[in-house]
Regions:
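Beta-propeller-forming repeat regions
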Residues: 1-300
């Protein structure tokens, strides 16, 4: 069954200077943002009141991506961030008092330095050895025994620049695969990579700035599909959103689920609680400044 999604526009202004990543704490929701600072906003008892800004770090410049999860397998969540301007990938352990500003350097761990044109972050135990890896752009970073050392790096697709990254089990064998889209190219590739040699399988090589990427089961058949969406940037007059429907044998059916609405950094979640993954996106460099929801109506 092909995925069927209904577009619902939400028109609203947005703050052009920040990107936000959301994380949940017991009873409250906080969010960490990028720019010259990485910070989290503490939710008050009444969430309609102003939230308190708490700086995590101001040591680097231009934080494109953030990720929150247990990256060092100690049972605690950490904050991972990549600084394009400073070309570093680091993570922060949460100090006993997370309201201290900025978080002390003693809680920072450096994963990699001298990284160029890297975008996109994900984490997963790729080789089932019980140790989490970080996928940063087209690179896999493996954690060293010595926590003070830089992580090992394996580049799986060096020609892919400024990518979006998604990780999930596509083959159905229980092992995660990696999906990359070249989010800042006008003739961009979308490809998935299979372990252990990370062979590339290109699904499309003519996309326009596919700066949205996710893995989810959109058609409810128990197989993970791949979503990507194109930007507009004032030159692409017919941007498209695609779901690549997983046929279960290593092949995919391309399904265009939307045309004419550009999107940037769209996310996948069940918005209306019906058990189906929906899509939420917003524009980039578009003066109309709109947020859009595509409700998944597959099977309805």
């Amino acid at each position: 069954m092909c995925p069927a999604l209904r577009h619902f526009p939400l028109h609203c202004p947005r703050n052009r200077s920040h990107n936000y990543l959301y994380r949940r704490q017991p009873g409250r929701q906080s969010r960490a943002g990028g720019g010259k600072e990485v910070y989290w906003l503490e939710c008050p008892q009444n969430p309609t009141q102003p939230w308190t800004k708490r700086i995590i770090t101001n040591s680097f410049v231009n934080y494109h991506d953030q990720l929150i999860g247990d990256v060092d397998d100690d049972g605690q969540i950490e904050v991972v961030t990549h600084s394009q301007g400073s070309k570093v990938l680091v993570y922060y352990k949460i100090p006993p008092d997370p309201t201290v500003q900025p978080w002390p350097d003693a809680y920072r761990r450096t994963v990699a330095t001298d990284l160029s044109q890297v975008e996109g972050l994900a984490m997963a135990d790729l080789d089932a050895n019980g140790r989490t890896e970080i996928i940063g752009g087209p690179n896999i970073f493996t954690r060293p025994i010595n926590p003070e050392s830089l992580w090992g790096k394996v580049t799986l697709a060096g020609s892919y620049k400024k990518t979006r990254v998604a990780v999930g089990n596509i083959y159905g064998d229980g092992r995660p695969e990696i999906v990359l889209s070249e989010g800042e190219n006008t003739s961009a590739r979308l490809a998935w990579f299979t372990p252990p040699l990370w062979n590339a399988h290109v699904l499309n090589s003519t996309l326009f700035h596919p700066h949205s990427l996710a893995i989810a089961d959109f058609d409810g058949d128990g197989l993970n599909d791949i979503f990507t969406g194109e930007m507009g940037l004032g030159t692409n007059l017919n941007p498209k959103l695609f779901v690549y429907r997983n046929k279960g044998d290593g092949s995919f059916e391309q399904v265009v689920i939307s045309q004419g609405v550009p999107t940037h950094e769209a996310k996948v979640a069940d918005i209306d609680g019906d058990g189906r993954p929906d899509i939420v996106g917003k524009t980039c460099d578009d003066q109309t400044n709109h947020v859009d929801i595509w409700f998944n109506e597959t099977g309805k």
